[in-house]
Amino acid sequence: QQLAADEYFTSYEIDPNDSIQVLTEKVFDTTISEILNIRSQLNQELLDQAIEALANSKRIEFFAFGGSAPVAMDAQHKFFRLKIPSSCISDQHIKFMSANSLNKDDVVVAISHSGTTSALVDTVKTVRSFNACVIGLMPSGTPLSKECDISLEIDVGDSARLNSPITSRLAYMAIIDVLAVG
């Protein structure tokens, strides 16, 4: 019942006098609440399309920068273990070189916690010019979401403000798990 009561989670703020136990509860409760909110907002039709595109691809590349790069590395590891040719690229020059070698049988998964990194948006445009499919994981209404063939939009809400980087990364990784096991 507590998981269903969103007010329970959003009312927490970190207080300097919080004990470690209270702080732990606040971080976990906020993270759980936000993950459940994100799950309920996912577009199932787009998830189906993304899973289908990945299943039919000859090669998958995961593109990301900065804090999104560990999510891309985790994704590449999951797909590699499924014996699917995949790579993770966080270097911009390598991304552009790779983009020029892609074709209609390939998929790029572009991962961005902001959706505004111009270098990633530019790379996605190049990938699309070679007819490869681009699946994006990013916030809604961002430049990246507008450039992807399949935009899996992930909006981490205000309730996650006390631990947004953790919550965001866990949400992205959970969606990668859905894509991998789908």
Question: Where do the model's predicted regions map?
Answer:
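Conserved acidic
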Residues: 23, 46, 167, 171
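Glycine-rich phosphate-binding loops that contact phosphosugars or nucleotide phosphates
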Residues: 52-182
